[in-house]
């Protein structure tokens, strides 16, 4: 009976997620129909909560652990609270971005609970903290006016944060990534990437001449080189490509982008010969089976999980995701593919695609050049992080150690991504506010003009007398008719 429930639920979950993903892109068909959009948003939320319920129902049936029921209820209360607060205070926020954020958090809670209940519980605590940031940041962005003026503050704080990891950071798998404070570990590069985007945006906002570009490139190189020195090559790639995209869009000079790609190629060649762990990752990428007992073990296990799961997966609780090293972080997409199916994993990737399409669309709509660059940079960070994670898990690119935003286990990654989504919502609200003010001003102007016309009509000399004269001939006409009779 349990096996039947698991198998039935996986097909239901795939169908629901297919519909949800279709609606993400179907929305673009109705840009000027708010009622139609609202209906689609409500449908998305309905399917999302059904997926959430389906996943935790299966987890409970397969384990019969009552803690799962309480954990599910706590999540449901939190997610509903997110919607209530956003709808109450941020009416101009993007509903699609909000839906996608909660959808990915639902999937994260389902798969992490399947892998390790303790990890899922710790992740939920970080979700609570991230929710506070997601609520406060749009308000701060609306009230704050100094963000574009803090150029060197962003650079200084960011470089100090990365240097602290280089000097006193804890090494993990050959790279210095985090600072440890008792039981808590913080990965500063996850937060510094936001400061990095704000630094470049504020520099490009001031000017895009050759001198300004040279200064921007020099400081950006310091960020990247510190990450390289820390052996965090995944982070270095993320920062460098974000810089490259922002510079290319600001200058519209393709040779800069092409030169940057060439520089990446040279950097990878140098890294192959200078860093042993980089060499191991490239060897594992080119032929993982030849080193399956060493560097290729992670990639091989990931590919085995994706391949054996097939299109529909084994069902929650029926696979072997814990056989994959670091499955809850770097290879979460492999665990999802194995148990929820390849179709479900592709839908998740497409939801990520719809997110950064919305962010890039926001960047094009922003009138303020500073926030235009900020949205572009944050969208690039998000898109590149998804690409590096999925690409590393599927052998499309060498493994980089980057996590899947909002889905993978990790407090620093989760908090930084929820901060980014809060900033995106803040910019959506800022972008919608001028349009709202224009509509209000137009209404007030029309009302004022109508009142003026009414006053002028009432004050016109002889207006009442002319009306009486128009009525008197009519009365005289009746009397004269009677006289004639």
Model-identified regions with their sequence ranges:
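TM-adjacent membrane-interface loops and short helices in multi-pass inner/ER membrane proteins
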Residues: 288-329, 333, 343-344
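Select subsegments of transmembrane alpha-helices in polytopic membrane proteins
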Residues: 42-48
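P-loop potassium selectivity filter motif centered on the GYG triad
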Residues: 198, 204, 305-315, 405, ...
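Hydrophobic alpha-helical transmembrane segments of multi-pass inner membrane proteins, especially
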Residues: 65-294, 334, 338-392, 419, ...
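A juxtamembrane structural motif centered on a specific transmembrane helix
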Residues: 389-485
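Membrane-interface helix-loop junction between the first two transmembrane segments
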Residues: 22-41
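Hydrophobic transmembrane alpha-helical segments in integral membrane proteins
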Residues: 1-17
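Transmembrane helix-loop junctions at the membrane interface of multipass transporters and ion channels
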Residues: 2-3, 57-63, 116
